[in-house]
């Protein structure tokens, strides 16, 4: 790597002499003109005043792209101001630069990217725009879809994950309720994502720990690097990295899948969500059946990432096991419990009660005591193992795990798109502009 260059963003709301004065003091190598004409006659006036190369375009992101391609930029200094650069545009700029590993500095802010990790095994990175949007369900779906053609390992990084990377051989063993209770009684979080993925995908998983998440989605602390080495020791043909909440693995994978909830609406244009959107080769919009016009969120996504393959989906309950007799449904929210109950009843299952309090152990215990049932249908989340499953086993109840299968509502085929992404990655390493 050569000399690390510094670029400045300047505008026409400042007099050209003021811009030149600031650029000389900060020892800037080149600049991008971002708009504003109040203090200048034309952009030529600015060019004549400056002693460095100036880039400009009606689309400031095209100008930035060109400057970055022609120079080894490692730092961008924002010398503009409102009204030229609004907070929304500045967050878009931050997203644009962080994706490329470039630091973005303003008068009272600094966005510094975590270093992207490159690995020598083909990989897909699944990232999300928040918690409870169905990211783990998508991770399991991707895992079981790809295992039809490849040896797959899923690497997770949860807030309840193990300090040392932990392997669960979902490809070699059955994940039973008894096994999970045994894990829980040893003081481990048996509902962590790597257990859930091993259960729902039937592949080997590596569970890692992370703590803290930044605005862009990078973690403060994690054991991901060790997890990568453990995953590679399993000799996978493809590794799937699965994010945690709105945070994600800082691995520069050949393919990215971004998971967005349709319920988030315009929120995805705010702050640094555009970074996550811009990374996606595939963008899976979950819960699209719960909004009146899911096409609106597709339009928002296209504004940020016009090249993405967008899939509008709904979740359909996928039961792992057979239901017998009267059933009770236990999930992480009352709304999801109601939706699942209705769909299962439509399938002929006799649901006599439900709870959406997996994340509230006290309420969950109280609710389960009030209902008489034969089969517990439960998500592997939060208090599932140490409360719901343990109680059901003590009472001799049958336990069926509840997963969610994404179903397209837009006449597209998510399964085939996931396979096609993997084929591109495995066959040609998925290289593309911006990676």
Swiss-Prot record:
Coiled coil regions in record:
none
- What biological processes does GO assign it? gluconeogenesis
Q: Which GO terms describe its molecular function?
A: ATP binding; cyclic 2,3-diphosphoglycerate synthetase activity; ligase activity
Show the catalytic activity. Answer: (2R)-2,3-bisphosphoglycerate + ATP + H(+) = cyclic (2R)-2,3-bisphosphoglycerate + ADP + phosphate
Grouped into one coarse class, the protein's main location is: cytoplasm
Q: Which key words tag this protein in UniProt?
A: ATP-binding, Cytoplasm, Ligase, Nucleotide-binding
Q: Where in the cell is it found?
A: Cytoplasm
Annotated EC: 6.5.1.9
Question: One GO term of the cellular component aspect?
Answer: cytoplasm
The UniProt entry's sequence similarity note says: Belongs to the cyclic 2,3-diphosphoglycerate synthetase family.
Q: Which HAMAP family match?
A: Cyc_PG_syn
Q: What does this protein do?
A: Catalyzes the formation of cyclic 2,3-diphosphoglycerate (cDPG) by formation of an intramolecular phosphoanhydride bond at the expense of ATP.
Q: List the protein's name.
A: Cyclic 2,3-diphosphoglycerate synthetase
């Amino acid at each position: 790597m050569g000399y690390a260059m510094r670029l400045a963003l300047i505008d026409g709301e400042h007099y050209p002499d003021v811009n030149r004065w600031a650029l000389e003091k900060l020892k800037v190598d080149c600049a991008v003109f971002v708009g504003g004409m109040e203090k200048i006659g034309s952009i030529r006036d600015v060019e004549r005043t400056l002693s460095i190369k100036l880039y400009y375009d009606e689309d400031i992101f095209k100008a930035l792209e060109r400057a970055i391609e022609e120079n080894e930029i490692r730092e961008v200094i924002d010398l503009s101001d409102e009204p030229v650069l609004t907070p929304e545009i500045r967050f878009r700029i931050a997203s644009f630069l962080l994706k490329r590993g470039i630091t973005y500095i303003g008068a009272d802010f600094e966005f510094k990217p975590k270093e992207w990790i490159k690995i020598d095994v083909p990989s897909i990175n699944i990232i999300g725009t928040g918690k409870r949007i169905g990211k783990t369900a998508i991770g399991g779906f991707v895992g079981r879809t790809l295992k039809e053609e490849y040896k797959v390992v899923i690497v997770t990084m949860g807030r309840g994950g193990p300090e040392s990377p932990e392997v669960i051989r979902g490809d070699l063993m059955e994940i039973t309720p008894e096994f999970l209770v045994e894990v829980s009684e040893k003081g481990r979080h048996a509902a962590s994502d790597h257990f859930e993925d091993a259960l729902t995908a039937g592949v080997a998983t590596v569970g890692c720990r992370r703590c803290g998440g930044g605005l862009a989605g990078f973690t403060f602390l994690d054991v991901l690097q060790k997890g990568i080495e453990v995953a590679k020791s399993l000799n996978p043909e493809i590794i799937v990295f699965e994010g945690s909440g709105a945070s994600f693995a800082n691995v520069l994978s050949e393919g990215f899948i971004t998971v967005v909830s349709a319920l988030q609406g315009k929120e995805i244009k705010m702050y640094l969500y555009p970074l996550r959107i811009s990374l996606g080769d595939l963008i899976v919009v979950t819960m699209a059946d719960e909004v009146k016009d899911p096409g609106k969120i597709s339009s928002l996504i296209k504004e940020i990432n016009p090249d993405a393959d967008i899939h509008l989906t709904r979740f359909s309950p996928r039961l792992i096991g057979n239901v017998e007799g009267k059933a009770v449904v236990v999930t992480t929210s009352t709304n999801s419990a109601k939706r699942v109950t209705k769909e299962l009843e439509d399938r002929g299952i006799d649901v006599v009660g439900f709870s959406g309090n997996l994340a509230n152990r006290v309420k969950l215990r109280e609710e389960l005591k009030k209902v008489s049932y034969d089969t517990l249908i439960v998500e592997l989340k939060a208090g599932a193992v140490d409360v719901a499953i343990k109680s059901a086993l003590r009472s001799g109840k049958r336990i069926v795990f509840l997963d969610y299968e994404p179903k397209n509502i837009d006449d597209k085929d998510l399964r085939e798109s996931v396979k096609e992404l993997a084929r591109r990655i495995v066959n040609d390493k998925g290289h593309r502009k911006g990676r």
